[in-house]
Amino acid sequence: MARIGDGGDLLKCSFCGKSQKQVKKLIAGPGVYICDECIDLCNEIIEEELSESSELKWDELPKPREIYEFLDSYVVGQETAKKTLSVAVYNHYKRVQAGGSSGDGSKGEVELAKSNILLLGPTGCGKTLLAQTLARMLNVPFAIADATALTEAGYVGEDVENILLKLIQAADYDVKKAETGIIYIDEVDKIARKSENPSITRDVSGEGVQQALLKILEGTTASVPPQGGRKHPHQEFIQIDTTNVLFIVGGAFAGLDRIIESRIGKKSLGFRAVLHGKDDPDGSDVFGDIMPEDLLKYGMIPEFIGRLPVITSVSNLDREALIRILTEPKNALVRQYKRLFELDSVDLDFTSDALEAIADQAILRGTGARGLRAIMEEVLLSVMYDIPSRKDVARVVVTREVVLEHVNPTLVPRDVVSKRAPRQEKSA
């Protein structure tokens, strides 16, 4: 088919027609041949198609109201934070859609700057969940990094470039896709310097990390080691542009409320002073009055604060909010545990006062919504241990006494349930 001459020694590519002398390599198949040039061309076509399919469809960019409604189905409360994030994320990806500039050449192009987000508030109130839910809705790569593990370059610990590696890995090493992703840096309050005054000694895990993060937050082409770890002079690097990467920076910022109160004069002394308890929900509402100077006093450097123009906060969760978290969201804990018991053909029910007791325990422990799962595990441990081995139990009922007094939940046998069923049919 592709043989030339009687000797059959001269072959040519079945696709482009070039002879084996005109190309570097000719690969044989069953009755066909393909050259290295055609293979390279096929690879380019496949890569282009994959990159086009992996890109975010900007025509379908959700509006702020749609983003808010999606967040509302997963996150209970925190209306101000959800509204702020919805607007900030929409504006960010609208900027990416516009290519970072607006206007025509005659009037001069207007560059749209990036607006990273600072999300502060007590632990267990939904900061991480908000960021995760945003990434899920937009279908963009998402990575979570812990600021406490980061150190300045040259010291023991993780380099800031490892944050970008996590994003690249989340995008299956598709760098172009990773360049429009979201990075959530948690525990950023732990890299605050010890005082607002510059330190004489080198602060490699505090101020040094803040300085190392500056260029990445602002937008730069960073060199990332493909296997992580420290940089070596002879290894290859992945180049990633962080200009269109949205950074959401979160932290509990314990003690920041006192700095804000002292500035706005809310703190009072004397016999008639209004005292707020440690777990008073009003304590976190003061974050709504935050100013950059408060973060400066806390230990964040001015350059770092300046790269986080959007500041929003989450508030402490009260009993009503915690009960809603247990029952309302799509992935509510009560629904999750009911599903676990359904897999063993057992119904699980919680009385209303049991849910109130679980919420009260979470408030007492000061762990917020994150502590609800630990309490549920403690309450259901004995039942989850016995139920898989028993076939006579049809229903488990958890009451307030089970939560507070650690008694065993009520087990309803299958024969009782089956006897009740015909009676209900007769009455109906």
Swiss-Prot record:
GO terms for molecular function: ATP binding; ATP hydrolysis activity; ATP-dependent protein folding chaperone; protein dimerization activity; unfolded protein binding; zinc ion binding. InterPro entries: AAA+_ATPase (IPR003593), ATP-dep_Clp_protease_ClpX (IPR050052), ATPase_AAA_core (IPR003959), Clp_ATPase_C (IPR019489), Clp_protease_ATP-bd_su_ClpX (IPR004487), ClpX_bact (IPR046425), P-loop_NTPase (IPR027417), Znf_CppX_C4 (IPR010603). It comes from the Bacteria. The keyword Ion transport does not apply. One of its GO terms (biological process) is cell division. Zn(2+) binds at residues 13, 16, 35, 38. CDD domains: RecA-like_ClpX. ATP binds at residues 122-129. Keywords: ATP-binding, Chaperone, Metal-binding, Nucleotide-binding, Zinc. Component of the ClpX-ClpP complex. Forms a hexameric ring that, in the presence of ATP, binds to fourteen ClpP subunits assembled into a disk-like structure with a central cavity, resembling the structure of eukaryotic proteasomes. Belongs to the ClpX chaperone family. ATP-dependent specificity component of the Clp protease. It directs the protease to specific substrates. Can perform chaperone functions in the absence of ClpP. This is ATP-dependent Clp protease ATP-binding subunit ClpX.
